[in-house]
């Protein structure tokens, strides 16, 4: 248990993660401190009962390689989960840990550049929207640590989104704050 994830997410995960890390810290006589962290792990012993594409049986190897590079005010966290899933993110260090921007790409060969604007971009494989909606209605976004801040703009792209017995192709969903609430824009090929 991490204590960082909402209960609905943490309850869907079980297992342990062996890992190896390297930390390098620079404390110059003049100038700012900096650090680099490399973490290698294997999620082989972890099972996930979350909806696809993050479902996983224990026993399936899933290597994770993460690199962190930062200073006293921010850090970048980038790496891979498996051979084809890559993440790149920038975090700000203040009174609260703030995810400034991030991009997750599946079926990719390398880490993508960070988005130009604050927000999160999720480039996912085909998804079952009903399963994900049920997860979020069950509290998956509740009880996020009060010590963390996440971007209000989220973009989700998927080649196929299935929901309510229908399939939509090349879907892009953008959620952002609007007057009086959250505004969601959807675009697709159909």
Identify the function of each model-found stretch.
Residues 1-77, 90-190:
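Membrane-proximal interfacial segments on either side of biological membranes
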Residues 82-86, 190:
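Glycine-centered tight beta-turn/hairpin loop motif at sheet-sheet or coil-to-beta transitions
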């Amino acid at each position: 248990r991490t204590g960082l994830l909402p209960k609905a997410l943490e309850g869907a995960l079980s297992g342990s993660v062996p890992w190896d890390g390297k930390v390098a810290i620079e404390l110059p006589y003049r100038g700012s401190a900096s650090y680099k962290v490399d973490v290698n792990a294997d999620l082989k012993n972890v099972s996930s009962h979350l909806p696809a594409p993050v479902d996983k049986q224990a026993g399936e190897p899933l290597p994770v390689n993460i690199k962190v590079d930062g200073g006293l005010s921010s850090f970048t966290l980038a790496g891979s989960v498996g051979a084809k899933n890559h993440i790149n993110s920038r975090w700000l260090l203040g009174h609260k840990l703030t995810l400034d921007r991030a991009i997750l790409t599946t079926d990719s060969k390398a880490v993508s550049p960070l988005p130009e604007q604050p927000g999160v971009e999720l480039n996912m494989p085909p998804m079952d929207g009903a399963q994900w909606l049920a997860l979020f209605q069950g509290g998956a976004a509740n009880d996020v640590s009060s010590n963390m801040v996440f971007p209000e703009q989220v973009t989700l792209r998927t080649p196929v989104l299935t929901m309510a017995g229908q399939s939509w192709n090349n879907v892009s969903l953008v959620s952002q704050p609007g007057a009086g609430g959250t505004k969601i824009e959807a675009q697709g090929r159909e």
